[in-house]
Amino acid sequence: MSIGDELVDADEVYRQARWKNQFEVLSKLPRVLQERVDAQKPVIEASGNSATPSNASRALVRHQQNPGDVGLVLNKKFADEQGHESVIERHDKLLNQTPRWHAPWHLTRVIHGHHGWVRCIAMDKVDNEWFATGSNDKTIKIWNLASGKLKVTLKAHDMTVRDLAISNRHPYMFSVSEDKTVKCWDLEKNTAIRNYHGHLSGVHTVDIHPTVDVVVTAGRDSVVKVWDIRTRLPVMTLPGHKGPITKVRCLPVDPQVISSSVDASIRLWDLVAGKSMKVLTHHQRTVRDISVHPSEFSFASACTNDIRSWLLPKGELLTNFVSQDLDVINTVSINQDDVLFAGSDNGSLTFFDYKSGHKYQTFKTKEAPGSPESERGILSSTFDGTGLRLLTGETDRTIKIWKQDETASQDTHPNLPWNPKLDSQRL
């Protein structure tokens, strides 16, 4: 077969990839195809950050499934004019890597007080002394982190409190609810001082812009709203999603807003232009949560049995985590120590090394005494300001606090085995 014939095959692979909506933009091909297009079709590795099918320096690799062997068999490989590694060389290097060891996590405290599911948790990361929770019981409760004792209960919503956001620059907290309202709370007076009206249905998510005095909300009406905190006016409405929006996150630079939705997409928004600058369509089901890395310019997203990380600002796929057995993933959180936590509907707590994608610990939570086993789902999570404590809100109406075992070592507590796959790990 001539090189020209191989390039025709390459064009066909990318035509199929586009048809299957694996990539939104194909004017610049990705450096490595992260997912197999078809088990019986080749995967292209292109040299450099961008390539076109006219470049001759590429490798054709065929994924073959043999009994007991999931491997990569090199069918054809052209010389790489740039001296880049082949797919096989990259895979071998990945196999030889040793992922970072992390100490295992264990339960240290169970906090009772809510009379409904704990839907959301927000941490005060300025002083790192208290946190707030919202529940199906329509209340917001503020707790002392060190003692676990209740400080105050806030009542103003008429329905479930779905999300909370605490300002790092002002003594304000924002809450959103199924009652269609957005409320601003004065934390010095513990009272609601502003209401923001404009959503047509339940509001599911809220976040505060880190540098501009605006708050961003979204929910069942499928639009993202940007509000001026002081005037209470919606300065911008961003349509685009085809279903209810599950989460919004704000960043100080573009994309200044990231949103996820029931329509299985993630949108990166340009607030200056007032439109989405990129749409990520790799997930196949409802994207239930997104979490921004505290120090790396990237974020993670989660849907049922699927966790992925993305490089910002353009939204390139970084890692497809091995998460096919995690059931419905409701929440993900990342700390500054590169630990990614995922909490599932079935009560599973799963911990990954964020950089390598290594799943190093997984176990089930324990429901509160008197609660049925079905009430052990994990709905919300956050790390404290140090990243050393993990807080989870659960369906048994409790908040649980988890810590790493300070006495553990790599010899006494080895992590789960490292079994990387070329099509799922960051290269």
Swiss-Prot record:
Keyword Ion transport among record annotations: no
Gene Ontology terms: biological process: mRNA cis splicing, via spliceosome
Highest taxon in the source lineage: Eukaryota
Residues annotated as transmembrane: none
GO annotation, cellular component aspect: catalytic step 2 spliceosome; cytoplasm; post-mRNA release spliceosomal complex; precatalytic spliceosome; Prp19 complex
Cell location: Cytoplasm; Nucleus
Cytoplasm in keyword set: yes
Keywords: Cytoplasm, mRNA processing, mRNA splicing, Nucleus, Repeat, Spliceosome, WD repeat
Renumbered ranges of WD repeats: 113-153, 156-195, 198-237, 240-281, 283-322, 324-362, 373-412
Main location group: cytoplasm
Pfam families attached to this UniProt entry: WD40 (PF00400)
PROSITE patterns on file: WD_REPEATS_1 (PS00678), WD_REPEATS_2 (PS50082), WD_REPEATS_REGION (PS50294)
Region span, Disordered: 404-427
Quaternary structure (record): Associated with the spliceosome.
Entries under PANTHER family matching the protein: PLEIOTROPIC REGULATOR 1, WD40 REPEAT PROTEINPRL1/PRL2-RELATED
Function: Involved in pre-mRNA splicing and required for cell cycle progression at G2/M.
Family under the similarity heading: Belongs to the WD repeat PRL1/PRL2 family.
Protein's recorded name: Pre-mRNA-splicing factor PRP46
Species of the source: Candida glabrata (strain ATCC 2001 / BCRC 20586 / JCM 3761 / NBRC 0622 / NRRL Y-65 / CBS 138)
Taxonomic lineage: Eukaryota, Fungi, Dikarya, Ascomycota, Saccharomycotina
